[in-house]
Design a protein with these regions (language model features):
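Predominantly a Rossmann-like dinucleotide-binding segment in NAD(P)-dependent oxidoreductases
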Residues: 41, 48-121, 126-127
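Contiguous beta-strand/loop segments that form the cofactor/metal-binding neighborhood of enzyme cores
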Residues: 105-178, 210-219
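Short polybasic amphipathic segments
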Residues: 160, 178-191
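C-terminal helix-rich "cap/oligomerization" subdomain common to oxidoreductases
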Residues: 29, 211-246
């Protein structure tokens, strides 16, 4: 994605780029330098960050309602991937970490304000195309235990759960990272008092695109900064090292 994004920037275009923004942190740094020189908007399209449910989960955690965060669990898996699909070819950016990691693996990072990470451990099953077919990453972030799962070869499983000293909050249903145009829920448990918050159907892709276009027009709107994309890429580089990939 990055080489074409750079070409578009150099052609004077604002760029909303499909995730992952790049194959590694070095490429992201290159893109950041080009963006600074050109002055056009450049953002990684992590649409789930605009979903009202995601925003609300973040608010609940940051408010301290569930107490001090102790554990974060995420998963984004699906099955029946065609072996010839580009998503399975490592050299072309394939694999669960590249394809699904920007959702499930990145979530603990932004939720914990990119606190220092440590103790990265991985369990991986390799695809015939050379990519990571199924991956579990366990790590600590700011002292919080985190577990993130990605897979292109297991039953559809999507969750985002945060547990604290006073309770927990979790995305209801089986759609934590693929809720498009349908109602969704948050399940909250604070000191034994359980509740459910409901969210109307929405198109988070449109919300993201609207935010990007509003910024182009000079209107106030939130964009995910490239500094966050760089931190994601740096962490993914570390995960790849532990996995045994280049």
């Amino acid at each position: 994605h990055m080489p074409w994004s750079i070409r578009a920037l150099e052609a004077g275009k604002h760029v909303l780029c499909e995730k992952p923004l790049a194959m590694n942190a070095a490429e992201v740094r290159q893109g950041i330098e080009v963006q600074k020189q050109i002055g056009k908007l450049f953002m990684e399209a992590s649409w789930n960050r605009w979903h009202p449910r995601t925003i609300r989960l973040n608010e609940i955690v940051k408010s301290g309602a569930i107490g001090e965060v102790k554990k974060i669990r995420t998963a984004f898996t699906y099955t029946d991937l065609d072996p010839a699909n580009i998503r399975a070819i490592y050299e072309l950016g394939g694999g669960g970490l590249y394809d699904l990691g920007p959702y499930s693996v990145a979530a603990p990072l932004w939720l914990m304000n990119f606190a220092p990470t440590s103790d990265i451990k991985t369990e991986v099953k390799w695809h015939a195309g050379g990519s990571d077919e199924t991956l579990k990453v366990n790590f600590k972030i700011g002292g919080v235990e985190a577990e993130a799962i990605t897979s292109m070869a297991t039953a559809d499983t999507l969750y985002f759960e945060v547990t604290g000293t006073k309770g927990s909050v979790a995305m209801g249903g089986n759609d934590a990272f693929n809720s498009h145009n349908k109602p969704s829920t948050l399940e909250i448990d604070i000191e034994g008092k359980k509740s459910v918050e409901n969210f109307e159907a929405c198109d988070p892709y449109q919300l993201m695109a609207d935010s990007f276009s509003n910024k182009i027009r000079g209107r106030e709107s939130w964009l995910m900064p490239l500094s966050e994309s760089l931190k994601f890429a740096e962490f993914f580089d570390e995960v790849f090292k532990v996995m045994g990939r280049p």
